[in-house]
Regions:
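N-terminal presequence-like segments and the immediate start of the first folded domain
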Residues: 1-73, 78-115
């Protein structure tokens, strides 16, 4: 099993790997909308935070020798489901930019807080 770390994405802030690659599958850890260089949230709006989280995920997938075209399942956590439409727009833009024609399975859930 390959353990994936990349200096271009936000470093893990706890005892976990950015991604692991068992048997050819790349499984990534959750990615917040933080700029990996500044270590801070990119913006207060959820669309830009979603775009940054997906950009971070792209960096980790690339470091694992994978891409967005190989994503089979995504789980998205938001603090308010009223943000659903903004998240969807940013997510759809990401998939289009990555050349993904058939979106992966996905779940979205509201949580009380995010780290």
């Amino acid at each position: 099993m390959l353990i994936v770390y990349t200096p271009t994405a936000r470093a893990a802030v706890g005892p976990y790997s950015e991604a692991v690659k068992p048997n050819g599958f790349a499984l990534t850890a959750g990615q917040p909308g933080l700029d990996p260089l500044a270590g801070a949230t990119v913006a207060t709006d959820v669309a830009n935070q979603t775009s940054q989280a997906l950009a971070n995920t792209r960096l980790i997938l690339n470091a694992a020798g994978s891409s967005a075209k190989s994503i089979v399942k995504a789980t998205i956590y938001v603090t308010d489901l009223q943000l659903f439409a903004d998240v969807n727009r940013a997510y759809a833009e990401f998939l289009a930019q990555e050349g993904v024609s058939e979106p992966p399975a996905r779940a979205i859930a509201e949580v009380s807080t995010l780290p």
